[in-house]
Curated annotation (Swiss-Prot):
Binding positions (Mg(2+)): 491, 493
Matching SUPFAM superfamilies: Nucleotidyltransferase, PAP/OAS1 substrate-binding domain
The protein's name in its UniProt record: UTP:RNA uridylyltransferase 1
Residues annotated as binding UTP: 480, 555-559, 580, 584, 598-599, 708, 714
Ranges of compositional bias, category Basic and acidic residues: 258-271, 339-360, 386-410
Originating species: Arabidopsis thaliana
Domain spans labelled PAP-associated: 656-714
Length: 764
């Protein structure tokens, strides 16, 4: 025995049970005699046997504890734990019915034995209205005597004897008033079950609360619930969630993610918005809370229709999705934009590829050759150069390099000393004169409501087409049409999110292109050989173009982040609109030509406003997270309750004209291109060495470094090469010079770029 006590004697058959009980109380043992046994028997204190029935327990008794450990104040009984009462006692000893001896060995579960309500709950039987249990009740009422000992019993896990059921029925009006079917529905559909069932939700809540308190106030390791690890690895019913949360249990792996992803995100709790908002203790498992958030969003999934995502972009809270690489997506869109804007033979070939392949009329060699050309064009510059060298084409350059050097831009950069002098120049005194002009330009770039309505019309149409073919696929809106930085006549960017590693994305895209063409959508082009398959189309009814890609989910999350930043301070949208308009006018907004994307320029504006003193924008990813999704191994979390931050930048009184001047002054003279990395994620400047983005021999990629907020290994400036970086910096210097000294800076700043001709004309 664990406590060193001696085993009490078994009751003799020659005395009655009352004398035996008195002998135990007076400490005078009586001689015992045991008859022949046909099965393994265990000693049992008859006083304990008289109090209530027992159950054959297939598990070690220590594992019944909620946390898998024996409490410190728990002393083992002075008798061996018995699994069946002595067969020689009176059938109705002390008025309680007794069991016949079990014919099964102790490692088997006697399905007809009686259990206490607590044992029933631990075994996973939440109620007593199960039809199987009720049938057993009726059988016990009809059979007054227990079955003969020689009768073979069926070993059915979960069945009870009549007395055990009666014991549970004694609590029927208490805190066990729901059956197993209701319990299963509660776990799958918590809100609908509570609203449609006739049970009192407070009863089940009190039941779980009482058991939680009895078990020490915690549920053991991980998500194992009240009974802990019971030796079989089964999960018990978790405690009910608080109002507004779902009980779906899918789980996240908190160990995933890179070191960069964990900065400012390693918190083990989440916050729900609304009437029932509550900050969870760090001991609560983050995966459970995230899945509750996911369930809450799924219940309101109609909110996330494609046309409604213009105002509410992003995956629902708690979603766990798969995404392609941001770098691969950028390469593919760069290629598609290049082909779409160049026009001519290449564009026609691109558009005919998908149609010929779908109809089966294309020559396989021609398709393969064209596919190799596309893939080759998406390779990194050094990889392309290496292939050309191997093929004996040493004089070959990428088309992007050729297009970025159509004139002599980039030859007029200032020296280091001149930049240092200009970096400390004060802003012009009359800068506020141009605020109204910049505001007017900003307002003229906002899409009209009629255009937004046309976009919604096209989105609803696309959603219906996709739902017919892939009912389980999700469509997400991303890009400028949803992040609040879109211009008039901007394309719509749609992500077709579908799970499954066995899905052939290229074939799926070809099928989608076929569906779109059959619905009379025009200019349907499919880029299937790129890293990220894309379909481009134009709606003849609305005149709006649309790009559809597969599983570019990270861009969807980034879209929500940008929109949330835009809600904090209107000066972000004003500055970003001016900068984007400048970049398009000056032709430094084409990634296939080695310049930056619109997304990169918006991140540059956000970072610039984070760095103002006092700051105009906070760093949302460094704040307590209220929004969480997982995209592959990247945990995307940040504070999205931006309504509380509307006055964050009120202490900074800089106007839009001052900010435009300061933005170009920073990127022309103050930014250290050799060592610095712009990081919106941290709201600070990082070093290239910290990111391992140092310049390497044969690779001039990290010349202007802009970190993606979530896929932190992705440098949005990697498209910039050693030629286009000079063009960019020269344009920044031109803009800073105009903002500092030009008498009409608003008009001069946004003058369209005109390439020089053979006579040297142009290049204003």
């Amino acid at each position: 025995m664990a406590d060193g006590g001696a085993e009490p004697p078994a009751p003799p058959s020659s005395i009655n049970a009352g004398e035996f009980l008195l002998s135990i109380l007076h400490g005078s043992p009586s001689p015992s005699s045991q008859g022949p046994q046909h099965h393994q028997s265990f000693a049992l204190d008859p006083a304990i046997a008289a109090i209530g029935p027992t159950v054959n327990n297939p598990f070690p008794p220590s594992n019944w504890q909620s946390n898998g450990h024996r409490p410190s104040n728990h002393n083992p009984p002075s008798w061996p734990l018995a699994f069946s009462p002595p067969h020689n006692l009176s059938p109705n000893f002390l008025g309680f019915p007794q069991f016949p001896p079990s014919p099964f060995t102790t490692n088997q579960f006697d399905g007809n034995q009686r259990v206490s309500p607590e044992d029933a709950y631990r075994l996973g039987f939440p109620g007593t209205t199960n039809p199987a249990i009720q049938s057993m009740v009726q059988q016990q009422q009809q059979q007054q005597l227990p079955p003969p000992q020689s009768e073979t019993r069926k070993l059915v896990f979960g069945s009870f004897s009549g007395d055990a059921t009666q014991s549970l029925n004694g609590l029927h009006n208490g805190n066990l008033k729901y059956d197993s079917n209701q319990h299963e529905q509660l776990m799958r559909h918590p809100q609908s079950t509570l609203s449609n069932s006739n049970m009192d939700p407070n009863l089940s809540h009190h039941r779980n609360h009482d058991l939680h308190e009895q078990r020490g106030g915690h549920s053991g390791r991980g998500n194992w619930g009240h009974i802990g690890n019971n030796g079989r690895g089964l999960k018990s019913t978790p405690p009910p969630p608080p109002p507004g949360f779902s009980s779906n249990q899918r789980g996240w792996d908190m160990s995933l993610g890179s070191k960069d992803d964990d900065r400012g995100m390693g918190r083990n709790h989440d916050q729900a918005m609304g009437e029932h908002s509550k900050v969870w203790n760090q001991s609560v498992d983050f995966s459970a809370e995230a899945n509750r958030l996911r369930g809450l969003s799924i219940q309101n999934e109609s909110k996330f229709n494609l046309s409604q995502q213009i105002d509410h972009p992003g995956p629902p809270k708690g979603a766990s999705l798969h995404s392609v690489s941001a770098a691969d997506a950028a390469d593919s869109f760069s290629m598609l934009n290049k082909e779409a804007r160049r026009g001519g033979e290449r564009r026609e070939e691109l558009g005919q590829l998908s149609k010929a392949k779908r109809e089966g009329n294309a020559n396989s060699d021609e398709i393969e050759d064209f596919g190799e050309d596309i893939v080759k064009s998406l390779l990194l510059e050094d990889e392309t150069g290496e292939k050309d060298a191997n093929d004996g084409k040493k004089d070959s350059k990428t088309s992007r390099e050729k297009e970025s050097r159509v004139d002599n831009r980039g030859q007029r950069l200032l020296g280091q000393k001149a930049r240092m002098v200009k970096m400390y120049m004060a802003c012009r005194n009359d800068i506020h004169r141009y605020d109204a002009t910049f505001i007017a330009i900003y307002k003229s770039l906002i899409p009209a409501e009629e255009e937004l309505e046309k976009q919604r019309q096209l989105m609803a149409h696309l959603e219906n087409l996709v739902a017919k073919e892939w009912p389980h696929a999700k469509l997400y809106l991303y890009g400028s049409c949803a992040n609040s930085f879109g211009f008039p006549k901007s394309d719509i960017d749609v992500c077709l999110a579908i799970e499954g590693d066995d899905i052939n994305k290229s074939e799926m895209l070809l099928k989608l292109a076929e569906i779109l063409e059959s619905d009379n959508l025009q200019n349907v082009q499919a880029l299937t050989r790129a890293r990220v398959p894309i379909v481009k189309l134009m709606d003849p009814v609305t005149g709006i173009s649309c790009d559809i890609c597969i599983n570019n989910v990270l861009a969807v999350v980034n879209t929500k982040l940008l929109r949330d930043y835009a809600q904090i301070d209107v000066r972000l949208r004003q500055l970003a609109f001016i900068v984007k308009h400048w970049a398009k006018s000056r032709r430094v907004n084409e990634t296939y030509q080695g310049t930056l994307s619109s997304y990169a320029y918006v991140l540059m504006c956000i970072h610039f406003l984070q760095q103002r003193r006092p700051p105009i924008l906070p760093c949302l990813q460094e704040m307590e997270p209220t929004y969480s999704v997982r995209v592959d191994n990247i945990r995307c979390t940040y504070f999205d309750n931006v309504d509380r931050l509307r006055n964050f930048g009120s202490n900074n009184r800089e106007t839009i004209a001052e900010l435009v001047w300061g933005f170009f002054n920073y990127w022309a003279y103050a930014h250290d291109y050799a060592y610095n990395v712009v990081s919106v994620r941290t709201g600070s400047i990082l070093g290239k060495r910290e990111k391992d983005w140092t310049r390497r021999v044969g690779n001039d990629r990290h010349l202007i470094c802009i970190e993606d907020p979530f896929e932190t290994s992705h440098d949005l400036g990697r498209v910039v090469d050693k030629f286009s970086i000079r063009v960019l910096r020269e344009e920044f210097e031109r803009a800073a010079r105009i903002m500092h000294q030009d008498p009409n800076p608003c008009a001069k700043l946004l003058e369209p770029y005109i390439p020089e001709d053979n006579n040297g004309q142009g290049h204003n």
